């Protein structure tokens, strides 16, 4: 299976849609360099979402949501701002997998997850809600 797309949306609409293609896919910093600035600024590639994209794919494949909003170095501190945003705006992550990226008729699996709990929890595969046990 290949990753076809990763969509991040909330109750206000699509936040980000990342489409993948055959071959090497890169996440790069496309921040424009401010040539008018007198300060020496450099495009670093920091904070463009490389690790977050990987964590969201992992989350869709069954990982714990805490990995998204917990400090990756200490594994203890929570980023409350991030956690609250994910819950309060009802963020939904949709991962689309396909057997063949070049075949529009290829078998497709759509996995959807959100960060809500209990009855509001979304844990779907091809539109069917799954229990935690079934999802794993």
Enumerate the language-model features and the residues they cover.
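Extreme N-terminal "head/tail" segments of very large remodeling/mechanoenzyme assemblies
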Residues: 1-109
């Amino acid at each position: 299976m290949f990753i076809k797309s990763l969509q991040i949306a909330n109750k206000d609409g699509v936040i980000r849609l990342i489409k993948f293609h055959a071959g090497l896919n890169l996440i790069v910093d496309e921040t424009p360099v401010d040539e008018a600035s007198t300060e020496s600024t450099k495009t670093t590639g920091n904070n463009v979402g490389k690790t977050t994209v990987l964590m969201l794919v992992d989350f869709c494949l069954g990982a714990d949501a805490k990995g998204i909003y917990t400090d990756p170095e200490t594994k203890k501190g929570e980023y409350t701002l991030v956690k609250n945003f994910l819950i309060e705006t009802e963020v939904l992550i949709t991962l689309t997998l396909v057997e063949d990226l070049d075949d529009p008729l290829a078998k497709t699996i759509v996995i959807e997850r959100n960060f809500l709990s209990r009855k509001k929890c979304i844990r779907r595969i091809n539109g069917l809600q799954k229990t935690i046990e079934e999802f794993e």
